[in-house]
């Protein structure tokens, strides 16, 4: 009898429903009354650079928000980010969609639509290996992600993009 309970205990996880690793936060914008989903800020430390990354979605856009928390960096409308992918020479170059600031906030966004934009789809198909951000006066910030961080960022993007489709007006 004891062996049956032990066997059942070890087999129980195989019959339990799969856990969703997406822990997204939902909020309503007080001004536009639009629903917004977000991963919240997840801390990353990569090659000495401390930053937090959040992926958010509204009915109109999907926003990647990089916030450099240790060394306050300045960014303006002309700042760019080069996203490098694992095992691939393809690079994604995007402009800062945020406003000018010296608080270390950098945004890049994609349109939220029924069909995922090709550049965003690339972020879902391949894992990001590093970022190269060029700020004012050609200042460059390099961020190289560890294997665990690559998987975390990929999971964050996949969860938000998947659930962002539910925000679209029918």
Predicted regions and their residues:
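An ectodomain-focused feature that recognizes extracytoplasmic/extracellular
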Residues: 19-77
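Secretory pathway export signals and precursors
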Residues: 18-19, 70, 98, 155
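Mid-length scaffold segments of soluble, non-membrane domains
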Residues: 70-94
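Short, surface-exposed loop motifs enriched in S/T, G, D/E and P with embedded aromatic residues
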Residues: 20-35, 87-98, 142
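Internal interaction segment
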Residues: 88-170
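Residue-level detector of beta-strand face positions
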Residues: 43, 80-84, 130-132
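Bacterial Sec-dependent N-terminal signal peptides
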Residues: 1-24
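Secretory-pathway extracellular proteins and peptide precursors enriched for disulfide-bonded cysteines
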Residues: 14-19, 64-66, 92-94, 148-152
């Amino acid at each position: 009898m004891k062996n049956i309970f032990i066997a059942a205990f070890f087999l129980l996880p195989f019959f339990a429903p799969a856990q969703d690793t997406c822990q997204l936060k939902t909020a309503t914008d007080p001004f536009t009354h639009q629903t917004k989903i977000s991963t919240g800020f997840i801390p990353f430390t990569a090659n000495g650079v401390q930053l937090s990354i959040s992926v958010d979605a509204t009915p109109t856009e999907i926003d990647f928000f990089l916030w450099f928390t240790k060394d306050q960096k300045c960014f303006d409308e002309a700042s760019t980010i080069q996203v490098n992918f694992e095992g691939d020479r393809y690079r994604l170059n995007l402009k800062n969609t945020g406003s000018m600031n010296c608080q270390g906030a950098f945004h890049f966004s994609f349109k939220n639509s029924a069909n995922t934009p090709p550049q965003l789809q690339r972020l879902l198909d391949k894992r990001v290996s590093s970022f190269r951000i060029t700020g004012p006066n050609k200042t460059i910030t390099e961020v190289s992600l560890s294997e665990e961080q690559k998987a975390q960022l990929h999971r964050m993007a996949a969860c938000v993009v998947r659930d962002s489709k539910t925000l679209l007006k029918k």
